[in-house]
């Protein structure tokens, strides 16, 4: 039977394999040289060799960022599906991706800097707008879903208009971000994603047994002493922060928040006490694997969002057939 620590071990093994063989594999002697050089760098301030720079400044941040972003998106997806009692919900329902896309389009078109900052604020403002619209419309699950769909369409149209009017080079930069990419990962990006993961999921992890009760009807939750509106709003704030910070440094990476929670449920059931951590780890593993696929299937470094779609869409279709017994 699959255990949570099995997934954690798989993440570690895959990360080590990517560091060892990613892009261009290193021989045992080269790895010994890298380890010695890195040790002397930290102990004796020795200058890093070119191989050490490749490992420490290119491969390692990319691996760490893939793990953090994958965990944030999949964890957000499983929480969203639980609180909405809908298996087709993902983190981008709140307008996070379209808000971030508009922020990136404005950053590239106007200021040409601070892309991650504007992407984050765009995602957060979109989420707050959806929550405000839902409150006006009565705090129902249906109104929240419809508000997210409407606002996402509107913000995507604005971002598309900006992309249409900018010069081709800037339009291409917007498209690359829209497809999701980890190719320019840095330790600063890793720190941003880690902050989002911590701020979003420490409260959710502590409240996971209460969040479980949101899978019941609101009346049943109230009878058990849970305020479903307040708890659902808190969950949405946590999910918004985690997803917005993840998207701000990686671009829009689809399917993880939708598919991975379903995979985790196959092995761990619907109880969030086990499901939340397993979804975080599975999402981390899946995005790192997708990034490996994106780097190896063609001579070019494809945006990782393409790989997640290629891997995620057929798998989700298989899940649908499996559920219906086809």
From Swiss-Prot:
GO terms for molecular function: transmembrane transporter activity. InterPro entries: ABC_BtuC-like, ABC_transptr_permease_BtuC. The chain crosses the membrane at residues 7-27, 64-84, 91-111, 113-133, 142-162, 164-184, 187-207, 241-261, 275-295, 301-321. It comes from the Bacteria. GO terms for biological process: siderophore-dependent iron import into cell. Keywords: Cell inner membrane, Cell membrane, Ion transport, Iron, Iron transport, Membrane, Transmembrane, Transmembrane helix, Transport. It is a multi-pass membrane protein. Its main location: membrane. One of its GO terms (cellular component) is plasma membrane. Signal peptide: none annotated. It holds the Pfam family FecCD. CDD domains: TM_ABC_iron-siderophores_like. It is found in: Cell inner membrane. PANTHER family: FERRIC ENTEROBACTIN TRANSPORT SYSTEM PERMEASE PROTEIN, MOLYBDATE IMPORT SYSTEM PERMEASE PROTEIN MOLB. Belongs to the binding-protein-dependent transport system permease family. FecCD subfamily. Part of a binding-protein-dependent transport system for an iron chelatin; probably responsible for the translocation of the substrate across the membrane. This is Probable iron chelatin transport system permease protein HP_0889. It comes from Helicobacter pylori (strain ATCC 700392 / 26695).
């Amino acid at each position: 039977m699959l255990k949570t620590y099995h997934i954690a071990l798989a993440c570690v093994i895959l990360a080590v394999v990517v560091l060892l063989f990613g892009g261009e594999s290193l021989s045992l002697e080269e790895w010994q040289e890298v380890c010695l050089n890195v040790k002397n760098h930290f102990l004796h301030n020795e200058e890093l060799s070119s191989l050490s720079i490749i490992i420490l400044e290119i491969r390692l941040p990319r691996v760490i960022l893939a793990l953090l972003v994958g965990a944030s998106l999949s964890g957000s997806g499983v929480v969203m599906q639980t609180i909405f009692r809908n298996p087709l919900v993902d983190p981008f329902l709140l307008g996070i991706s379209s808000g971030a896309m508009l922020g990136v389009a404005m950053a590239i078109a106007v200021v040409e800097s601070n892309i991650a900052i504007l992407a984050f604020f765009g995602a957060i403002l979109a989420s707050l707008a959806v929550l405000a619209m839902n409150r006006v419309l009565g705090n129902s699950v249906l109104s929240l879903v419809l508000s997210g769909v409407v606002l996402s369409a509107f913000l995507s149209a604005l971002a598309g208009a900006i992309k249409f009017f900018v010069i081709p080079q800037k339009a291409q930069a917007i498209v690359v971000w829209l497809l999701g990419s980890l190719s320019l990962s840095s330790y600063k990006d890793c720190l941003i994603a880690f902050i989002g993961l911590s701020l979003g999921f420490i409260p959710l992890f502590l409240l996971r047994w209460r969040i479980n009760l949101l899978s019941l009807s609101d009346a049943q939750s109230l009878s058990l002493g849970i305020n479903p509106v307040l708890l659902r709003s808190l969950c949405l704030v946590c999910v918004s922060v985690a997803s917005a910070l993840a998207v701000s440094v990686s671009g829009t990476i689809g399917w993880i928040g939708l598919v991975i929670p379903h995979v985790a449920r196959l092995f761990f059931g619907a109880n969030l006490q086990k499901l939340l951590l397993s979804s975080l780890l599975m999402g981390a593993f899946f995005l790192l694997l997708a990034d490996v696929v994106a780097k190896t299937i063609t001579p070019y470094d494809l945006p990782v969002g393409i790989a997640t779609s290629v891997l995620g869409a057929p798998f989700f279709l298989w899940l649908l057939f499996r559920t219906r017994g086809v």
